[in-house]
From Swiss-Prot:
Residues forming coiled coils: none
Known function: Plays a central role in 2-thiolation of mcm(5)S(2)U at tRNA wobble positions of tRNA(Lys), tRNA(Glu) and tRNA(Gln). May act by forming a heterodimer with NCS6/CTU1 that ligates sulfur from thiocarboxylated URM1 onto the uridine of tRNAs at wobble position.
GO BP: protein urmylation; tRNA thio-modification; tRNA wobble position uridine thiolation; tRNA wobble uridine modification
Name listed for the protein in its UniProt record: Cytoplasmic tRNA 2-thiolation protein 2
Length: 405
């Protein structure tokens, strides 16, 4: 049970009560015998709950998790068209390397699919330095014959270009920055940023005739996503946010998460073993530079990161819980126009209370004295058929007259 009491939760969201990060355990840079194959190795890899093993045994272990996640569930048809989303993070490069390795094996062990790679350039949204085009071109050379494409976040899929033809100076006008600036809270901006990225992936996959998209989310990312989805009001679709297969994307495109069984330590070791060079640092996603308490997503990520450091097995338990809390599916149930989450079929008392509070705050003293009028206004808002879930409706309210899409 949690040892943090209610009195310990202050304005910082209990981050002050977190245990300080411990030093990571891992690579033993010393000669020794591999406990798996017995080969003398100059570098042993010691994962949590596993014996020290050589580089080849560790890579076999990590790559087996990737193949097993796809093979056990049989979610990837033979010769499927696959789009791999690369953002330059360590996780995305690990997935790229695993996919390339699986496709270069002999016929018996080969992963039979046709893969393409897309890099979503979001530097204009981050406001930082321009993307490292040279490093991306080096990736394209290393992982030939995979085709690499680049598209800017906020642009249409029609602006998709091959890596060799892409130029950072030739970019379409981007309206995403304008919409992000209108959102008051970083929580809303990060949520909207994530939904726009996912919708762009679906559009690119449709343009390239890809039926499946590979997303490089590991166990820590999925645990954070599960808790965040519930907190934002998307509990009804939280199971799909962490599932191996997510079928909510447009045009029937299916999103797969083949790295969901890997943890942060395994990713770090894989990067070292294969000498990969991530294009962005860990924790440099949109909005994370603002600090742990700047948004709900950042605070949740800090909480899960602390669990990963001190109680590694707990993180896997958290995200696997998502598989067991799926809502009952109804064929006629409508979905959100923005995030494709199922809409609430019944009037929720919780949402009614939220809208009631919002109506009182906006109306001022006059209407707040009339409880029936406030409750009636709250019900009207919930029953209004705008095609949005609660979380996306909150974003729409901050945007005003601008549309989400």
């Amino acid at each position: 049970m949690c040892s943090i009491g209610e009195d310990d939760v202050g304005d910082e969201g209990a981050t002050h009560a977190m245990v300080a990060e411990s030093l990571p355990t891992g690579i033993v840079i010393s000669p020794g015998d591999c406990n798996k194959c017995g080969v003398v190795s100059s570098e042993l890899y010691k994962l949590n709950f596993r014996v020290a093993e050589c580089r080849d045994c560790f890579l076999n272990h990590a790559r087996h998790k990737f193949r097993a996640s796809l093979g056990a569930a049989k979610v990837l048809p033979r010769n499927a068209e696959v789009l791999l989303a690369v953002d330059g993070s360590a996780e995305s490069l690990v997935l790229l390397d695993m996919l390339h390795f699986a496709q270069t094996q002999n016929t018996f062990r080969r992963l039979h699919c046709n893969a393409r790679v897309v890099y979503i350039d979001d530097q204009s949204v981050h406001g930082g330095e321009s993307m490292n085009l040279q490093a991306l071109q080096a990736l394209g050379t290393r992982y030939e014959p995979l085709e690499f494409y680049v598209v800017e976040l906020g642009a249409s899929a029609c602006s998709l270009q091959r890596l060799g033809q892409y130029s950072t100076s030739l970019k379409e006008p981007n309206g995403l920055n304008t919409k992000l600036e209108k959102l008051r809270s970083l929580t809303a901006r990060q949520d909207y940023h994530q939904q726009q990225r996912k919708n762009l992936l679906a559009s690119v996959a449709q343009k390239l005739s890809c039926s499946h998209v590979f997303e490089p989310s590991v166990s820590g990312d999925l645990a954070t996503q599960l808790l965040t989805s519930i907190a934002l009001g998307r509990g009804g679709s939280a199971a799909l946010d962490v599932a191996l297969l997510d079928d909510r994307l447009a045009a029937g495109v299916k999103l797969l998460r083949p790295l969901r069984d890997l943890n942060e330590q395994e990713v770090r070791f894989y990067v070292h073993a294969c000498q990969l060079k991530p294009l962005r640092e860990s924790g440099s996603s949109y909005g994370q530079e603002r600090g742990q308490t700047a948004s709900l997503q950042n605070l949740t990520a800090a909480f899960v990161g602390n669990l990963q450091q001190n109680y590694p097995a707990t993180v896997s338990t958290v995200f696997r819980t998502g598989d067991k809390i799926a809502a009952n599916a109804h064929m006629e149930q409508a979905s959100c126009a923005q995030c494709q989450s199922p809409l609430d079929a019944k009037l929720s008392d919780t949402l009614l209370a939220i809208e009631y509070s919002r109506a009182v705050s906006e109306a001022g003293v006059g209407l707040s004295k009339d409880g029936d009028a406030s409750e009636s206004l709250a019900k009207q808002r919930l029953e209004f058929k705008d095609g949005l879930c609660h979380a996306c409706r909150c974003i729409q309210l901050e945007l005003g007259y601008d549309t989400l899409s």
